[in-house]
Design a protein with these regions (language model features):
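Chalcogenol-based redox active-site neighborhoods
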Residues: 1-144
Length: 144
């Protein structure tokens, strides 16, 4: 999101020549995502930078306006780049879709974290079921 509204961000613009810590959540404003996952990365963004991360990004299969509002509500926008995978295309390309139809949420992203170094996946952590452990910022920091 820019001051002038939504702006698409391409893969190369986000990942080429950079080391990016990206984490994905099933839904903005959901309990675990809002109380633990996003705040963990917001609070420790500087530690990630100190370990060689150029960009910290949060992604969800939500629209850009929801992601922008969620980032503002969590004081994340200065530390974490909030990314909307509105149609779930990036999530599908990774093969990390989650069928949350039973909760009325449709197709979403599994909870995961990854480090992409110059366009190549360096670290990938995917949670089992409804867990929140290996995709946390603390777990990633220990891996770096």
């Amino acid at each position: 999101m820019t001051d002038k509204g939504p702006k698409p961000l391409g893969y190369s613009e986000l990942f080429e020549g950079k080391r990016v810590a990206l984490f994905a959540v099933p839904g903005a404003f959901t309990p675990t995502c809002s109380q633990q996952h996003l705040p963990g990365f917001v609070n420790k963004a500087e530690e990630l930078t100190d370990k060689g991360i150029d960009t910290v990004a949060c992604m969800s299969v939500n629209d850009v306006f929801v992601m922008d509002a969620w980032g503002k509500s969590q004081n994340a926008n200065e530390k974490v780049l909030m990314l909307a995978d509105g149609n779930g295309e990036f999530t599908a390309a990774l093969g990390l879709q989650l069928d949350a139809s039973g909760f009325g949420m449709g197709s979403r992203s599994q909870r995961f974290s990854l480090v992409i170094n110059d366009g190549q996946v360096e670290i990938l952590n995917v949670e089992d079921g409804g867990e929140f452990r290996v995709s946390s910022c603390e777990f990633m920091i220990d891996q770096l």
